[in-house]
């Protein structure tokens, strides 16, 4: 995440639960725990990651792994597996190959795509508590969003990787994500770009003006927070023993 989960402290609505699509190796787990969020649904398409994820989730009773690729329909697709793991995608490389010449697809594997709404209906009675959705699935984000209209009505926030060029062939662009999420009252309030044609965006339903100001001044806010962060670290590390 280009914007750390725990830098989202402006959030007026409490994050009760998270749906994280594109689990990979649970890199965001420590940040979620630090933010006191224990209810997390992880979705991952790559079967090679399942044993690692399940082993890591054993001590968390309120976290579960969904073993499928989030999409608009129940279908079978080929997942392209990359040599760095994180660039694996259901789509072929576009400008990604030019931007990251050392990254290649090394194999393919057949996976199922499912609409998130259908899977949640089959497996959860308390899906209303999952009001934060995080998507990082390498250009396939819009297809995944189209499979979760019911959950988007519930969500207060969507954090998503976005593209400004065809990083993956046929991938959704920022304007496409903006237009689609607007149907559910979700407006883009923050954006962080890289120089590689992609970035991260945060969408919210409430306090839009305040949220936009917050993200505009986030670099300054981080500097202001730094002494307090170091103070808390010192207290926890050396005093509370």
Which residues are covered by each model-predicted region?
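Phosphate/nucleotide-binding beta-alpha loop and adjacent structural elements of enzyme active sites
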Residues: 1-241
């Amino acid at each position: 995440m280009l914007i750390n989960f725990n830098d989202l402290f402006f959030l007026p609505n409490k994050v009760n639960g998270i749906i994280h699509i594109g689990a990979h190796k649970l890199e965001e787990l420590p940040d979620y725990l630090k933010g006191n969020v224990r209810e997390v649904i992880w979705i991952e398409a790559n079967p090679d990651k399942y044993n690692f994820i399940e082993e890591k989730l054993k001590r968390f009773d309120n976290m579960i792994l969904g073993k499928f690729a989030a999409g608009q329909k129940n279908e079978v697709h080929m997942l392209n597996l990359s040599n760095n793991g994180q660039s694996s995608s259901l789509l072929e490389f576009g400008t990604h190959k030019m931007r990251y010449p050392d990254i290649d697809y090394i194999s393919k594997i057949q996976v199922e795509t499912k609409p998130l709404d259908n899977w949640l209906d089959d497996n959860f009675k308390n899906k209303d508590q999952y009001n934060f959705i995080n998507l990082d699935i390498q250009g396939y984000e819009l297809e995944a969003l189209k499979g979760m209209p019911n959950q988007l009505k519930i969500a207060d926030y969507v954090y998503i990787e976005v593209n400004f060029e065809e990083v993956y062939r046929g991938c959704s662009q920022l304007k496409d994500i903006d237009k689609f999420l607007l149907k559910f009252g979700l407006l883009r309030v923050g954006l962080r770009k890289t120089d590689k044609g992609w970035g991260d965006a945060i969408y919210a339903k409430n306090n839009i003006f305040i949220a936009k100001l917050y993200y505009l001044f986030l670099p300054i806010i981080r500097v202001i927070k730094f002494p307090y962060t170091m103070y808390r670290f010192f207290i926890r590390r050396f005093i509370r023993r």
